[in-house]
Amino acid sequence: MASKPIEDYGKGKGRIEPMYIPDNTFYNADDFLVPPHCKPYIDKILLPGGLVKDRVEKLAYDIHRTYFGEELHIICILKGSRGFFNLLIDYLATIQKYSGRESSVPPFFEHYVRLKSYQNDNSTGQLTVLSDDLSIFRDKHVLIVEDIVDTGFTLTEFGERLKAVGPKSMRIATLVEKRTDRSNSLKGDFVGFSIEDVWIVGCCYDFNEMFRDFDHVAVLSDAARKKFEK
């Protein structure tokens, strides 16, 4: 069911719980093909790329069931979410094509917003929003796609700005939620994985623009943080 009270934004009510990855659960990076420019800085794999793809396909299926037949507007939070977003909408389009059910509306309309609240691995506490006029989302079903829910600050602040224009509903899709004491308790509605509080790279996650091209989600080494910290 697509309808959801705006005041429930960020509470995760009625969601299917994410795949829980226990603390200290890793794969040895030597068991994977790691590009030479990444190898010195990655020694632990948290989420293999194949697992990520399969999990995103399941999220797309859940989203399809929720919004089928409705006009869905999906907002990609740039640029960290681009990889997750592209994979998600590819699966959404494929699922609708072969679902066997006819719909008079496209599976989604895509939009892009640039938000920035991090430098190095720390939230600055200040949110910068670069986007078109948010009023286009008035009376629309909106799904915000973010790569990770960490402190929750970014999506809380952006959510407040979006609420002001009066969307019909607002939900969050994210690949990863961190279990961290720094969280403001914001929860996503469609969540791939629940992980411990470690800094991750790969599969579109970066550290100051490095490692986005790595195919797996890995834990960033101390050596990488020292070398690439700005």
From Swiss-Prot:
The keyword DNA repair does not apply. Changing D150A: Strongly reduced catalytic activity. GMP binds at K79, E146, D147, I148, V149, D150, T151, G152, F153, T154, K178, W199, I200, D206. Pathway: Purine metabolism; GMP biosynthesis via salvage pathway; GMP from guanine: step 1/1; Purine metabolism; IMP biosynthesis via salvage pathway; IMP from hypoxanthine: step 1/1; Purine metabolism; XMP biosynthesis via salvage pathway; XMP from xanthine: step 1/1. It is an enzyme of class 2 (transferase). Binds 2 magnesium ions per subunit. The magnesium ions are essentially bound to the substrate and have few direct interactions with the protein. The active site is at D150. Its main location: cytoplasm. GO terms for cellular component: cytosol. One of its GO terms (biological process) is hypoxanthine metabolic process. Belongs to the purine/pyrimidine phosphoribosyltransferase family. Catalyzes the transfer of a ribosyl phosphate group from 5-phosphoribose 1-diphosphate to the N(9) of hypoxanthine, guanine or xanthine, leading to IMP, GMP and XMP, respectively. Plays a central role in the generation of purine nucleotides through the purine salvage pathway. This is Hypoxanthine-guanine-xanthine phosphoribosyltransferase. It comes from Toxoplasma gondii. The gene is HPRT.
